[in-house]
């Protein structure tokens, strides 16, 4: 489905999220870009987000309300958000409430039983993992299903997550839309990459340090390469928010093979990350399923593609909608380390293929825009294509 015309509501639009700047990640980026695009289209936008240090706050084109919560999905955050919503129930009752991620959805699952708290329009966006989580038990499935029934619209970023949502919650069929990921609006226009002789080929991974992101899988695949190849590769790992002792495992594995140079950068601000992309030759993010967590899309693939980096990734979840196999990158079936190593070796030896995939990726990354997504989400319910 798509919205072909826009009827802006006279009532305000409240975007409520636990993940917003200065938090990094795909969901935080999605929420920020939808808020900015909606304000640019003339909507009266107010964002409710997790607490943040005042010195980190930006100047936004919409009203910002920081809530007294950390932004996790634990019980304390749920209770604090519920109190805020109940206290403002009268103003929310006549407004459009947009929830782009699972944290506030959990709170809404319980508040939906109170007739006094029913927003005029409720709009939800699903990314993938929460669909599996919400359908993991009969109670959660019932609560989530009831919330979806109350929603005016729901959206997903990919066809994969749309099909997953409809499989678990088929009653969403008459209200579901696609709102695909796009490049950040503050993303610098990247000039074409100049050919340059290099002694080293840099493989880059950007993502939080978590088993689902597959840094350890990529590292082990690179360590499988022949010595002559391995000695000319550097593996750069960008990301923080360590999960358990995962970083320790990564560093231990990196130290087991001194022939491969591995660098850990930690978190890097967006304005500095662009320079890291430009110094790299191949982007790798070999995500895997981890419990009920799945890669629904991956905005970081678009950013890498915009820097004309060929991509190596696992063919899992919605990744194939962010990386076109053989066109913008190479997709490998998970749990096939030899095939993954072969993909790296292929790109290492074939500079022409790296350039072709990278240039195709530049065009592919620019195909979607946030304004179209905002129009799709918030157009009048009577406007359908």
Predicted regions and their residues:
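Short His-centered aromatic/hydrophobic patch
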Residues: 99-105, 126
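Conserved donor-binding/catalytic core segment of Leloir-type glycosyltransferases
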Residues: 155, 195-213, 219-223, 236
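Conserved acidic donor-binding segment of nucleotide-sugar-dependent glycosyltransferases
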Residues: 324-326, 330-337, 346-352
